[in-house]
């Protein structure tokens, strides 16, 4: 199946010069969504990525992470932006182009022996994915790999990540 045909290109969003890859059209296509989850599952299994938990990055990582966790018979844990989780959290601060941001995870969500797979819709520069891996490693988890629907090649995101399997379905 041609997933690129199901991903809408929006020029100049969110600012001029950016080509936004809109996955809402993929999400609304039942057969395409099923193919996406089935293909991610197959690629994870083939690569030996059998986690205890799938960790979804806010917020589109939740959309693919939950069904992937179900298929892999794993739990799902969200990583959120600051102030979105109600209980005590672990957090990590990371650099943005202009400033810093934080990611948080509930303190009781994972333990130091858990094996995790990190999932998001897209990898560009890799900053948020690396920060997520740093957060999980800080609490003692083993990061098995990453799974993304889209990779924006040429932005160096893959090179910032730990040396583990990285699964992508569509490259731009």
Curated annotation (Swiss-Prot):
Gene Ontology biological process terms from the UniProt entry: adenine salvage; AMP salvage; purine ribonucleoside salvage
Which leading EC class covers this enzyme? transferase
Keyword Kinase attached: no
Return the Gene3D superfamilies for the record.
Answer: 3.40.50.2020
Q: What is a GO molecular function of this protein?
A: adenine binding
Q: How does it assemble?
A: Homodimer.
Protein's name according to its UniProt entry: Adenine phosphoribosyltransferase
Annotated disulfide bonds: none
Broad class of where this protein is predominantly found: cytoplasm
What keyword terms does UniProt attach to this protein? Cytoplasm, Glycosyltransferase, Purine salvage, Transferase
SUPFAM superfamilies (UniProt xref): PRTase-like (SSF53271)
Q: What does this protein do?
A: Catalyzes a salvage reaction resulting in the formation of AMP, that is energically less costly than de novo synthesis.
**Matching InterPro entries:** Ade_phspho_trans, PRibTrfase_dom, PRTase-like, UPRTase/APRTase
- Family per record: Belongs to the purine/pyrimidine phosphoribosyltransferase family.
Q: What is its EC number?
A: 2.4.2.7
Specify whether Glycosyltransferase is a keyword of the entry: yes
Q: In which pathway does it act?
A: Purine metabolism; AMP biosynthesis via salvage pathway; AMP from adenine: step 1/1
Swiss-Prot/TrEMBL catalytic activity? AMP + diphosphate = 5-phospho-alpha-D-ribose 1-diphosphate + adenine
Provide GO CC annotations from the record: cytoplasm
The protein's location, in the record's own words, is: Cytoplasm
